[in-house]
Design a protein with these regions (language model features):
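A short, N-terminal "cap"/entry segment at the start of jelly-roll beta-barrel domains
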Residues: 1-50, 123-168
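Ordered, small/hydrophobic-rich secondary-structure cores
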Residues: 8, 13-98
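Conserved short histidine dyad/triad with adjacent acidic residue
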Residues: 35-43, 49-68, 95, 103, ...
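Short strand-coil-strand connectors
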Residues: 47-49, 86-87, 112, 161, ...
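Short hydrophobic/aromatic-rich beta-strand segments that constitute the beta-sheet cores
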Residues: 53, 83, 117-120, 197, ...
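Short, conserved beta-strand element in jelly-roll/cupin
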Residues: 67-83, 181-199
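Short acidic-glycine-tyrosine-enriched beta hairpin
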Residues: 87-103, 200-217
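Ligand-binding loop in jelly-roll beta-barrel domains
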Residues: 90, 103-127, 216-238
Length: 238
């Protein structure tokens, strides 16, 4: 069970023999159109902190324009989305895209068909912060830098106002890291190569396109081959 695991794979259709469960109905007052049916599975959460990570799917709907209620990272697995902005511009999201909407950002969710996504949500007060990533929808640029694969490198592309959530693209050369106690929760998607994650319960290899989750406080070892690239979505409790 993931509740007792130090790390685990995030399955696109939810855990084996559990799958995705139907969630409560959206408030009709928040919708312009649609009668969406949303299903999901929460893999890890801190309800008192407004934190959760998981996978969900949903049928089509269009929301009212308004401030986004949470900081949310999303990795789209299926479908497409249009995020309309007050200035008339639109951000187009499609399957394979990773993106972040910051809490309080004004936009309209316009989804014309079925979508499935992996997500991380962080809620809480919004402190004053001068961070450019709080003033836009950040679509993660997976090829922003052409790194030298002999050198490990991280490119931070989003930091929330509270400083508790960040999104980075990490590129690693060949690595063999001994067990280290983790100081944050981490949702990781392998973009290229593979990584071997180990803990007291054993080792698991994750390859290109797979997503896994590491819990804060776990003693985790890591091994990678040459040319491994990952998206790390990190949450550090306040």
């Amino acid at each position: 069970m993931t509740e007792k695991s130090s790390f685990f794979k995030v399955e696109p259709e939810g855990p084996l023999r559990i799958g995705l469960q139907e969630w409560e109905t959206m408030d009709p007052k928040s919708l312009v159109s649609g009668n969406p049916i949303q299903r999901g599975h929460i893999y890890h959460e801190y309800p008192n902190l407004g934190y959760m990570t998981g996978v969900c799917d949903c049928t089509e709907f269009v929301e009212q324009m308004g401030p986004y209620q949470v900081d949310e990272f999303m990795l789209f697995l299926e479908g497409e989305l249009f995020l309309d902005l007050p200035d008339g511009k639109t951000v187009h999201i499609k399957a394979g895209d990773a993106f972040i909407i910051p809490k309080g950002f004004e936009c309209r969710w316009r989804q014309l068909g079925y979508v499935r996504k992996i997500f991380m949500i962080v809620d809480g007060d919004i402190p004053q912060a001068r961070n450019p990533s709080l003033e836009r929808i950040t679509v993660v640029n997976l090829d922003k830098q052409k790194f030298d694969f002999d050198i490990s490198n991280k490119d931070i592309q989003f930091l929330n106002a509270a400083g508790t959530m960040r999104v980075e693209v990490e590129q690693l050369c060949s690595l063999a890291q001994p067990p280290i106690k983790q100081i944050e929760n981490k949702l990781v998607t392998v973009l290229e190569g593979s990584v071997v994650i180990g803990a007291t319960e054993g080792e698991t290899t994750f390859g290109t396109g797979e997503t896994f989750y590491i819990k804060k406080g776990a003693e985790i070892s890591m091994k990678t081959n040459l040319k491994t690239k990952m998206i790390n979505v990190c949450y550090q409790m306040p």
